[in-house]
């Protein structure tokens, strides 16, 4: 249905896809994400050729210059699926325009809070709302736009979160 071309896969989820038949899918590239030194070697069996690289290494090797292509602002940017609480799962699409307008509105609203209660460059953002929950209310896009440092803690584990906060 969504026909994704790129899969960003954290090593934590590798067991969920180890038997997936990538040759029958639209996925052309797999980008490996790992914070624990886990190698992607052997994880994808005969689909190892689809692994484009490790996320941090790809970022490090990338040029700081990029000429973004023009495309219609109503092009789909993200797709979310419901869990099917009222029937079959349903896909929800967000366009680039929707994400930009939401981010601008959110940044303007937060910038207008009294007593400097909003966010500003130099702040650190760590989402507690799951990413699948309406883009964590869209704030990761706003945080990127404003230039906040972002910390993504992974699975909800109270002790680990406290270690990150303290």
Segment roles from a protein language model:
Residues 77-105:
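Conserved AMP-binding A3 loop
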Residues 7, 76, 82-85, 125, ...:
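Conserved S/T- and glycine-rich ATP-binding loop of Class I adenylate-forming
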Residues 1-16, 90-93, 127, 148-156:
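Short beta-strand->loop structural element characteristic of the AMP-binding/adenylate-forming
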Residues 31-34, 55-56, 62, 129, ...:
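Residues at the C-termini of beta-strands that transition into short coil/loop
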Residues 60-81, 88, 114-124:
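Conserved pre-ATP/AMP-binding loop-to-beta segment of ANL
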Residues 1-57:
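Structural core segment of the AMP-binding/adenylate-forming
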Residues 5, 11, 56, 74, ...:
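Structural detector for helix-capping/boundary residues
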Residues 100-124, 132-166:
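Conserved AMP-binding/adenylation subdomain of ANL enzymes
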């Amino acid at each position: 249905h969504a026909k994704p071309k790129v899969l960003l896969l954290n090593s934590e989820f590798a067991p969920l896809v180890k038997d997936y038949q990538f040759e029958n899918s639209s996925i052309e590239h797999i980008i490996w994400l790992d914070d624990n030194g886990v190698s992607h070697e052997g994880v994808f069996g005969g689909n190892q050729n689809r692994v484009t690289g490790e996320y941090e290494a790809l970022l490090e090797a990338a040029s700081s210059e990029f000429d973004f292509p023009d495309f219609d602002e109503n092009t789909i940017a993200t797709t979310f699926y419901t869990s099917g609480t009222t029937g079959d799962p349903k896909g929800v699409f967000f366009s680039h325009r929707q994400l930009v307008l939401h981010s601008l509105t959110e940044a303007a609203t937060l910038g207008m809070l009294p007593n400097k209660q909003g966010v500003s460059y130099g702040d650190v953002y760590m989402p507690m709302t799951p990413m699948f929950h309406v883009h964590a209310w869209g704030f990761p896009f706003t945080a990127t736009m404003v230039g906040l440092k972002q910390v993504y803690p992974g699975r909800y584990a109270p002790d680990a979160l406290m270690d990150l906060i303290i």
